């Protein structure tokens, strides 16, 4: 999965 903000265990989509 993707997440914003990236702070958990998912794919950092904020990069």
Curated annotation (Swiss-Prot):
GO cellular component, one term: extracellular region
Domain of life of the native organism: Eukaryota
Disulfide bridges in this chain: 1-14, 2-10, 6-13
Tissue: Expressed by the venom duct.
Keywords, comma-separated and alphabetical: Disulfide bond, Ion channel impairing toxin, Neurotoxin, Secreted, Toxin
Subcellular location, principal: secreted
Localisation per UniProt entry: Secreted
Molecular function terms, GO-annotated: ion channel regulator activity; toxin activity
UniProt similarity note: Belongs to the conotoxin M superfamily.
Domain remark text: The cysteine framework is III (CC-C-C-CC).
Function (record text): Probable neurotoxin with unknown target. Possibly targets ion channels. In vivo, intraperitoneal injection into fish provokes paralysis after 5 minutes.
Listed name of the protein: Conotoxin In1696
Organism per entry: Conus inscriptus
Organism classification: Eukaryota, Metazoa, Spiralia, Lophotrochozoa, Mollusca
């Amino acid at each position: 999965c993707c997440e914003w903000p990236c702070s958990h265990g998912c794919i950092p989509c904020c990069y």
